[in-house]
Regions:
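Terminal amphipathic alpha-helical/low-complexity segments used for targeting or macromolecular assembly
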Residues: 1-59, 177-192
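Short secondary-structure boundary/capping segments
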Residues: 6-7, 52, 98, 122, ...
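Hydrophobic alpha-helical segments typical of transmembrane helices
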Residues: 45-48, 140, 158
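Flexible, glycine/small-residue-enriched loop-and-beta-strand segment within the central core
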Residues: 66-150, 170, 175-192
Length: 192
């Protein structure tokens, strides 16, 4: 049996972004988000967000202007806080661990566009998943690119662009992000 475009997309394979099923879902999500982001009652707003996502744990809270493409590829653990203007482009799975906190304007981007102009012009897209461990804190305006895994207990400095994967217990900053400190499991900087 042939895979659907949604199945190919979620698996990180080449797919047609203008597939009818995908267009219908994106349109539905945009309409829902436009309405939900206007809700001032925090509990109601966050309950509505949760209903559109694949999985959320307990104590899920996102401020308004939360944006994503599909929702069915977003998996978030317990105790998540997202500040204003969080964007998750979820063509592939985005998995976020427990006790994670995102500053304003954090962007997680799984889509990958072909370098070959002919393939781009044919509306072919791909993607790569993003995985974020437990107890990760991201400062404002952090950007995480496709295929990145961020370990447990990582701090990502404001404005960083994360282009590659990082291990547990580090502080990363910059564009592209680089390690500036290693941490012990209590969060203390390890002196060299």
């Amino acid at each position: 049996m042939m895979k659907t475009e949604r199945e190919k997309m979620t698996a990180g394979e080449s797919y047609q972004e203008f597939d009818t099923e995908l267009i219908t879902r994106r349109k539905f999500i945009r309409q829902q988000l436009q309405e939900i982001n206007q809700i001032t009652d925090n509990d109601n707003r966050n309950h509505r967000f949760q209903s559109l996502l694949a999985k959320t744990g307990t104590n899920f809270f996102v401020e308004s202007e939360f944006k994503f493409d599909y929702g069915f590829n977003i998996h978030i653990g317990d105790h998540f806080y997202g500040n204003y203007d969080i964007t998750m482009l979820d063509t592939c799975p985005i998995t976020i661990g427990e006790h994670c906190y995102f500053g304003p304007n954090v962007g997680l981007y799984t889509p990958v566009h072909p370098l070959d102009a002919k393939r781009r012009n044919a509306d072919v897209e791909m993607g790569a998943p993003i995985t974020i461990g437990d107890s990760v804190w991201m400062g404002g305006r952090v950007t995480v690119l496709p295929g990145v895994t961020i370990g447990n207990r990582v701090v990502v400095g404001a404005g960083s662009v994360v282009t590659k994967s990082f291990p547990d217990d580090v502080v990363i900053v910059g564009n592209p992000a680089r390690i500036i400190h290693h941490l012990d499991q209590d969060g203390n900087v390890i002196k060299n």
